[in-house]
Every structure is written in structure tokens, then in C-alpha cells.
Swiss-Prot record:
Signal peptide: none
UniProt record similarity statement: Belongs to the cytochrome P450 family.
GO terms assigned for molecular function: heme binding; iron ion binding; monooxygenase activity; oxidoreductase activity, acting on paired donors, with incorporation or reduction of molecular oxygen
Role summary: Catalyzes the C6-oxidation step in brassinosteroids biosynthesis. Converts 6-deoxocastasterone (6-deoxoCS) to castasterone (CS). May also convert 6-deoxoteasterone (6-deoxoTE) to teasterone (TE), 3-dehydro-6-deoxoteasterone (6-deoxo3DT, 6-deoxo3DHT) to 3-dehydroteasterone (3DT, 3-DHT), and 6-deoxotyphasterol (6-deoxoTY) to typhasterol (TY), but not castasterone (CS) to brassinolide (BL).
Sorted UniProt keywords: Brassinosteroid biosynthesis, Heme, Iron, Lipid biosynthesis, Lipid metabolism, Membrane, Metal-binding, Monooxygenase, Oxidoreductase, Steroid biosynthesis, Transmembrane, Transmembrane helix
Expressed in which tissues: Expressed in sub-meristematic regions of shoot and root apexes, in zones undergoing lateral root formation, in fruits, and in all flower parts, with a high expression in young flower buds and at the joint in the pedicel.
Main subcellular localisation: membrane
GO annotation, biological process: brassinosteroid biosynthetic process; brassinosteroid homeostasis
CDD domains xref list: CYP90-like (cd11043)
Cofactor entry: heme
The name this protein goes by in its record: Cytochrome P450 85A1
Species assigned in the record: Solanum lycopersicum
Amino acid sequence: MAFFLIFLSSFFGLCIFCTALLRWNQVKYNQKNLPPGTMGWPLFGETTEFLKLGPSFMKNQRARYGSFFKSHILGCPTIVSMDSELNRYILVNEAKGLVPGYPQSMIDILGKCNIAAVNGSAHKYMRGALLSLISPTMIRDQLLPKIDEFMRSHLTNWDNKVIDIQEKTNKMAFLSSLKQIAGIESTSLAQEFMSEFFNLVLGTLSLPINLPNTNYHRGFQARKIIVNLLRTLIEERRASKEIQHDMLGYLMNEEATRFKLTDDEMIDLIITILYSGYETVSTTSMMAVKYLHDHPKVLEELRKEHMAIREKKKPEDPIDYNDYRSMRFTRAVILETSRLATIVNGVLRKTTQDMEINGYIIPKGWRIYVYTRELNYDPRLYPDPYSFNPWRWMDKSLEHQNSFLVFGGGTRQCPGKELGVAEISTFLHYFVTKYRWEEIGGDKLMKFPRVEAPNGLRIRVSAH
């Protein structure tokens, strides 16, 4: 009986303590002129609910508090904006104090010189260096031939096999980028890079708690290893004095570029290119295969476009820049895949001073999460929004609407958009002209916080 009374007292005491803690945290952030919303627990806030429920959490909060509300997610107090006009205002006003506000874990692991972490003149310089590597001329003359060569090799010997298309597209996105950046082929060095890189990616999506066995710790350790690998590569190239025709070679060739980067800046830029291209290229490619399987008429139209290109060529001829530019329906498939799968859920900004937005005062240092996911399913923008309909993108103006934020917006719009589209287009070209496929079935897809198949997405491939 005494034990039961002690247990009961402890239980009620814990309930009272938790209630008081929640109340204290709410009062702490109940400042005048802040948007409505809830803040959850101290330190952790509402991160658990956000990551677990994702879109449902956002919809519930919007139903209660409107399209502009406060929360505490990803380790910091955050304002969530789900209003298209406000989103655009936030994205185009970096000069007024709305700078990138990516999680500390991402900044720590991608490096202090990465393009997402720097502002002002430093951002302009680093962005200029990046754009010089992936300009239309570079894509046409240097990168597309490398991509074509890689895709031909990567898609060899898939006939009569069951493959995990998620695993294949993950490797494809990483190894293709590594070939373009540093000329590294499928060697032991590439494998070492890849295993550490996957740890790095998971680390950027975690709370910055540097304890053993946490994703953040593994990601940070992976960064150290990758930095050492890249530093060794730079030193070896500098010692050999041989100019390599890849991105790293271009950055190191002082006569070829006006952007003079330090070794640390080059390393962070390379890691950023690998990171930013990996998630979008791999996941969009996987989901395109999924959607094409589920929509035979779309696949028929896409295959028709690519067979027309192949009919003009010898079997061994690569695709060139003019071929890529002619792939209008392919581009439509990629854009529709990006919209419907929602590879990118939103964009983070941070206030550098107290700011008035939408009639509220947002304190200095708060994050603003421009949550763009719901825009992708707005029937006013996309009739029948949950259907996979690439033909809607044959109207070129749709891609340039202010509401289309899959590739970001403002001065931070994704600089690698065209390179990514070129990679996915080349993959689809060889995949649909060489193979047919059917799903094995039973594989689960998750759409939040990342689009992924936890147990893989298996398909049975046969020659076309």
C-alpha cells in the first residue's frame, strides 16, 4: 500500500512538473506582437511532433493559428510561413536582414564557407565561383559528355535482374558528381568517399548533439575524413602541376578562373556541390521511375521522345547539348515529379535584427521556415493537384511562376538546377530506351521528412 501511494504521488508530481514546464515555456515565448502558436518543450520544442507527423502537424497548426505562426522546431524558435505572398517577400529580402537560417548541424557539417552559410559579398563571390563551374557553356562542353559516359556505364548489365532503384540512383547521383568534380571513377577512393558521404548527409538532418552514436557525431566525423581526402587530392594535384579538366581542376587553374579560392573554400564548395545535387538528383530519379511505372501513357510519351533522338544516332553516339535541349517532355516529367513528390519541403531564413513581418515583430535570431510543400498541391495553381500530369508543364510559363519554389527563390535560387535536370534527363534517356521494368511490390514509400523507401524500391528489369 505504501509503495502504491509513493508511486501515485510520484506520478502526479511528474504530471504537475511537466504541465508547469510546458506552461513556463509557453509564457517565456508569449511576447507581445509575436504570431500565435505553441512552443512545446524547452530545448526540444515541437521537433518530435514535426518530424513524426510532418504535413499533418503543419496542417493542424495552420487550422488553429493561420498561415503565419510560431513554433520551436529543429532546435530553435521558428516562425512558419505558409502564405505564398509572404513567402516571396521573405525570399527576396535578404538585404533587409532575412539571411539563410539553416540548422546548426548543416552549417557545422557542410562547412563555414559553404554557399548556404555565407552572406553579402562572401555569398556573391562563392556563388559566382559555383556558377562558373556549372554554366550552360560548362554543361555543354565539359559536364554533359562526362554525365553521358557515366550513365552508359552505370546502366550496363541491368537486364534480367531485380534491382533496388533507390540504391542505384543514390550511387548514381554521388558517383556522377564525383566524376564531374574530381574525375574520380568507381575506385576504392570513390567507395571511401561514398560511405563517409552518406553519414555526412544524415548528420545534416539531425539535432546538433555531439555525442557518440548520434547522427550528428557520425556526420561531423565523416566531414573530417572527407576534408582530409580532398585536401590530400588538392596537394597531390598541386605537386604534379598537371591541369585536370574537371571542376576541381578549373578552380585550381588560376589562369582559367577569376575566382581565387583558398583550399578551405574549395573544399567547402566541393562538399556543397556533392550534397546539394545528391538528394535532389537521386530522389527525383527514383520517384520518376516510380511515377512512370504507375502511369503507362506518360512512359509511352517519354519513350517516344527519346527513341526519336536515338533514331538519329548510331548506337555508340552520345547525346549532346542540342539533344538535351530538345527533351521538352522529359523536363516536364522531372518538374512534375519534383512537384508531386515534394523533394524539398521548404526554405529556412533567419532574422539578423528585430523585424516587422505581416504585422508581427519577429525577434533577432529567430528562424523563418518558408514552408512551400502545400503550394505544390494548391488546386488554384495546379488543377487536380494530386494527379501525375507532366503535360501541365508544357506551358513554359508555369515553371517561372512566383509560386513555384521547388528550386528555392530570390537570390538563393538553386544554382545547380540545370545541371541536375541534365543529369536526370540523361539517366532517363538511357533507362527508358534500354529497359522495361515492373515493381516487385510491397515496398513502402515515406514522403517526410525525406522522400525515401526505408526498405528499398525493388524493380525487375528486362531489355526493351
